[in-house]
């Protein structure tokens, strides 16, 4: 209790915590030694102060230790396509559809997500609307990844340590450090990420945290239109993280021969509408939703290092859709998720 008070005092005085201090603070929270009032203070305090890469790193380390593991054979080759959410863009489920395209291109995808908080259709809502069963035990998720190339981990089942913070977070009702660490606590131990963030200021923070956490390769992106994805509307700010280091650049759709289109063409109002758009993309229909998926899938394939450059990755993404392989992955995933 005294440790919690001391570290909350530092946050209240706008002092940054070290990774170790944040790890220790989150340990107190996760193991039930912090009160609801203290958790609420942590939520509001970190929100007002602003989270540092070291604080994100420390929190992620703790919750990674507490996660229920998915027993995959080779976690270092898996990719997660995930966003922080909170961009209020109401786009269809681009990251999940991108996951099917990656799997169709031979990349094993371990998708980590939840039901909707801020969007019209969370990844779990979308998969359920497709007919998939999402609340699966770790061994079953591992089997799906191995046999189909795509598996989904429904976050609440894999993060029992997060239960302590649910009520205080809901009562305070602001975006906080807990929203930031979720995407980085993949239960399959993923080392490769295409990670979208809701604000440009967080791109480099996440990149530094990922580097310190030892990822093999990641792209952290924030797209024009304020979205946590590679944007078809305009430029996307990208930071690449690899074992060699960190570099940032701006990407434009024109680099892959894609014309800019309005994000209004990829917005939906429900999971069912998202399913309709997703199936049109995977069945080969031309248009803005397809372009949006191809841009994101290009970066996802590049993360897997199955392509030498973005143009090769783009061609692989097109082949995954146009050959019907991506749609086949979706159909097999839905079928097997209900059988196992």
UniProtKB/Swiss-Prot annotation:
Binding of anthranilate 1, residues: 83, 114
GO cellular component, one term: cytosol
Enzyme Commission number: 2.4.2.18
Coiled-coil regions listed in the entry: none
Assigned keywords, A-Z: Amino-acid biosynthesis, Aromatic amino acid biosynthesis, Glycosyltransferase, Magnesium, Metal-binding, Transferase, Tryptophan biosynthesis
Binding positions (5-phospho-alpha-D-ribose 1-diphosphate): 83, 86-87, 91, 93-96, 111-119, 123
SUPFAM superfamilies noted in UniProt: Nucleoside phosphorylase/phosphoribosyltransferase catalytic domain (SSF52418), Nucleoside phosphorylase/phosphoribosyltransferase N-terminal domain (SSF47648)
Binding site for Mg(2+) 2: 228-229
Protein name, as recorded: Anthranilate phosphoribosyltransferase
Organism: Aquifex aeolicus (strain VF5)
Lineage: Bacteria, Pseudomonadati, Aquificota, Aquificia, Aquificales
Record gene name: trpD
């Amino acid at each position: 209790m005294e440790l919690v008070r001391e570290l909350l005092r530092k946050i209240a005085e706008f002092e940054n915590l070290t990774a170790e201090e944040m790890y220790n603070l989150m340990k107190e929270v996760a193991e039930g030694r912090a009160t609801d009032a203290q958790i609420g203070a942590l939520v509001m305090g970190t929100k007002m102060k602003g989270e540092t890469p070291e604080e994100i790193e420390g929190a992620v380390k703790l919750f990674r230790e507490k996660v229920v593991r998915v027993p995959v054979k080779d976690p270092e080759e898996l990719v997660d396509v995930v966003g922080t959410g909170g961009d209020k863009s109401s786009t269809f489920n681009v990251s999940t559809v991108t996951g099917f395209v990656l799997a169709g291109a031979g990349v094993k995808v371990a998708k980590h997500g939840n039901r909707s908080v801020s969007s019209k259709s969370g990844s779990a809502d979308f998969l359920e609307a497709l007919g998939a069963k999402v609340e699966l035990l770790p061994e079953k998720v591992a089997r799906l990844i191995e046999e189909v190339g795509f598996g989904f981990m429904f976050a609440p089942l894999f993060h029992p340590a997060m239960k302590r913070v649910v009520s205080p977070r809901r009562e305070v009702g602001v975006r906080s450090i807990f929203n930031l660490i979720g995407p980085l606590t993949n239960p399959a131990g993923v080392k490769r990420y295409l990670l979208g963030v809701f604000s440009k200021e967080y791109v480099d923070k996440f990149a530094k945290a990922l580097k310190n956490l030892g990822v093999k390769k990641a792209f952290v992106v924030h797209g024009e239109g304020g979205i946590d994805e590679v944007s078809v509307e305009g430029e996307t700010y990208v930071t690449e993280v690899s074992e060699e280091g960190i570099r940032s650049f701006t990407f434009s759709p024109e680099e892959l021969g894609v014309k800019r289109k309005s994000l209004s063409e990829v917005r939906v109002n429900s999971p069912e509408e998202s399913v309709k758009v997703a199936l049109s993309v995977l069945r080969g229909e031309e248009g803005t939703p397809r372009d949006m998926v191809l841009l994101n899938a290009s970066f996802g394939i590049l993360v897997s290092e199955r392509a030498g450059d973005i143009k090769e990755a783009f061609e692989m993404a097109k082949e995954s859709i146009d050959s019907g392989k991506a749609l086949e992955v979706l159909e097999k995933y839905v079928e097997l998720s209900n059988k196992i």
